[in-house]
Amino acid sequence: MNKLLERHGINCEIDRWRDRGEISQLIGHKVVDVHYDDELFQILTETHIFTLYHESDCCEHVYLQDIAGEVSDLIGNEILKAEESTSGENPLCCGEESFTWTFYKFATIKGYVDLRWYGSSNGYYSESVDVVVTKLNK
């Protein structure tokens, strides 16, 4: 989970319980770099690392389903908008007992980047995306 930190030679421990945050905290930060795969999206700023992922318990699956826009438009620019919304409509598969879409919208002077996360479960486990905001030790 710390590939972005390793790439920049930063030694910092991400603690999902201590550093739980809101995506709106990203507004006003200048983005240095971004790393993502289907289970993780990290944004490194000059002072913090913002990590979006899902801490799995048992019987759920949450993943980054789609990205609209150019992620590179975030790098080197200040975040002007950072919003989260969710929807419980239009499941990807039929027969899923419970599902949640989670959307993140980021804006810079260069454009928008939208993330679409999809979570499904048996109805007893969280399908939400965890947002962890960690202050860098410099």
What are these regions (language model features)?
Residues 1-138:
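Surface-exposed, interaction-prone regions used to assemble/regulate multi-protein complexes
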